[in-house]
Amino acid sequence: MSMEGKTCVITGATSGIGRAAAEALAAMGARIVMVARDKKRGEATLAELRARFPGADHSVHYADLLQLANMKRVAADIAATEPRIDVLLNNAGAMFAWRKVTADGFERTFALNHVAPFVLTHGLRERLFAAAPARVVNTTGALHHLAKLHLDDLKLERNYTAFYAYKHSKLCSVLFTRELARRWAGKQVTANCVHPGEVATRFGEQAGGLIPLTFAVIHLFGSSPKRGANPIVRLASSPDVAAMTRCYFYKEKLARASPEAENDDNASRLWKATALLAGIE
């Protein structure tokens, strides 16, 4: 299928499934706009995209998505340079062994895995509307099935563990996707989320503690980044899912999210709480 003339914004596009998704979409003719933290990896990835897929003017913007000001600034930068965005892939994510808070007072996992996609999507909303029909795809995880929403402790000040923080952030991701789709109904912008499965990537390498070792073992049995990116690429490009929205996918199959994640009251309350924390009306 062709993505000629389409612009795709991708976070976490310099490694792993994000990079594989960027390459696959570029091969279809899409123009890739990356959001990256590391300038060295960003420039290397951009150079490779331009060399392998010269038909489009690929670009990269730099931001530390742990910082609220950076989230808002990079969204504004992209909105200022892109008249339309056909696909937004919120793919960047991490797990951290120890609880640390950002300059804004957010626990890091919550900031990167939930607040950043929320802020970036909000900041790019007019460009997505301008491209309608457009798509938002959020990378989530099956571990959300093990989480309960704790609106009274979004900053995870009580009983922090890396596992708890991660699964809670993935629950937030599913809830955000569902509420986004509800609020944007009629805008011709779909919103879906996907668990790509276990993939052999760099995920967890810099998390600290025993997390790198744990993921190293898991990655021995994981699929390749290219294969892991397939469900994301499908949601971004396939006409088969063009009309689907507010859905959760396990790999390439439509699946049921947890009852906690399908609770509309949870989704609405989380949206309002996140908007308040992020200073978004």
Model segments located where?
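Rossmann-fold NAD(P)H-dependent dehydrogenase/reductase core
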Residues: M1-R202, L277-E281
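A short, mixed-charge helix-start or loop-turn motif at secondary-structure junctions
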Residues: T11, R158, A162, T214-I218, ...
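Short acidic-hydrophobic sequence patches enriched in Asp/Glu that either
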Residues: R41, G209-L210, L220, N266
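C-terminal helical subdomain
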Residues: M71, S169, C193, F215-R256, ...
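Short, flexible, mixed-charge acidic loops at enzyme active sites
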Residues: L149-L154, Q206-L210, Y248-F249
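Hydrophobic alpha-helix feature that most strongly marks membrane-spanning transmembrane helices
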Residues: A185, G208, S237-D240
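A glycine/serine/threonine-rich, flexible loop-to-helix segment
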Residues: A200-A216
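Short glycine/threonine-rich loop-to-helix capping motif typified by GTGT followed
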Residues: E205, E260-A261
